Design a protein with these regions (language model features):
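Start-transfer (signal-anchor) and selected internal transmembrane alpha helices
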Residues: 1-30, 144
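Transmembrane-helix motifs of polytopic, lipid-linked glycan transferases
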Residues: 125-146
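Helix-to-loop transition at the C-terminal end of transmembrane segments
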Residues: 29-46, 61-69
Length: 169
């Protein structure tokens, strides 16, 4: 091999590394941009209900009695932490109504909301932070399966900008 082809190979690898870093930063940016402007989904409203310590049954029994309820009242009671309910109420509610769900995320989310406030972006930021663990995890998985750093970095790059992973981060 001549020195020119070796230099071209190094240059190619350097550009590839820069491209991977740029794509990774872009994927992280997508995860944290406009967290408060995305549509608040049904699952997110149920998550807010769960971390507030109320169950679906309690909400229906207390508030669906044939009278008009304002959105502000529902948000104040069921999408914010209040002193009536504790983290243990969150665990009990999950155990009775949705035992297939692990309480760890909901307890973490409850403490996160208590620490940083009940805004939509705050609740979503915890999930976005947790989603960053997918990068070392997918790299490690690829390393275990293929013993190849390049396969790992390609997988990280794909997951970084995957619409599915960005949307549900």
């Amino acid at each position: 091999m001549n020195s020119k082809s070796i230099q071209n190979g190094r240059l190619h690898r350097n550009w590839l590394k820069i491209l991977i870093v740029v794509i990774l930063i872009t994927g992280i940016w997508f995860r944290f941009t406009n967290l408060d402007r995305k549509v608040y989904s049904f699952d997110e409203s149920i998550t807010s209900l769960r971390i507030s310590g109320y169950t679906w049954t309690e909400m229906v029994q207390q508030d669906f009695q044939g009278k008009t309820i304002s959105v502000a009242d529902l948000q104040r009671k069921y999408q914010q932490i209040n002193s009536e309910k504790t983290w243990w109420d969150t665990v009990k509610g999950l155990a009775t109504e949705e035992p297939q769900l692990s309480p760890l995320y909901f307890i973490l989310a409850r403490f996160w909301v208590q620490l940083f406030g009940p805004q939509v972006a705050t609740v979503r930021s915890l999930s976005a932070l947790i989603s960053l663990l997918v990068f070392p995890s997918i790299y490690w998985l690829c390393w275990e399966l293929f013993h190849s750093a390049s396969v790992g970095w390609m997988a990280v790059t794909i997951v970084a900008v995957s619409p599915f992973h960005v949307l549900y981060a």
